[in-house]
């Protein structure tokens, strides 16, 4: 599927996709080296490249929330989830997290941490 999609891309959009792909190895290196602020900046660069792929990647509400987050401490982020919204994953330095969480009080905050086991999702359910 990905190969078919890339073949249909214009040369400009193809360059955007390849820039994003190149970010993968750099992102891994930055995380492993503990260069998390640079990782946050790279997330921002990747998000900006992804938005260039098409108008349906984002919308005004998402852009406003993302820009607000950058102005209030986030260094970068990206939209995750299926079309029509999803959620923003933001990198915010530890010393700025509480400020941003307070500023985004009308949104849902889901804390996360890195796991050595790969991707994990934990559900807490209360049974009545």
What is each stretch, according to the model?
Residues 1-76, 89-128:
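C-terminal nucleotide
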């Amino acid at each position: 599927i990905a190969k078919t999609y890339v073949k249909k891309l214009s040369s400009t959009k193809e360059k955007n996709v390849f820039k994003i792909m190149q970010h993968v190895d750099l992102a891994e290196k930055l995380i492993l080296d503990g260069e998390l602020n640079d990782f946050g900046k790279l997330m921002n660069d990747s998000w900006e490249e992804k938005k260039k792929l098409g108008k349906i990647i984002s919308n005004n509400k998402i852009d406003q929330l993302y820009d607000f987050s950058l102005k209030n401490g986030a260094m970068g982020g990206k939209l995750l989830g299926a079309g029509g919204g999803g959620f923003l994953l933001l990198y915010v330095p530890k010393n700025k997290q509480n400020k941003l969480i307070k500023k985004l009080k009308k949104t849902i905050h889901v804390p996360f941490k890195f796991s050595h086991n790969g991707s994990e999702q934990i559900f807490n359910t209360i049974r009545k």
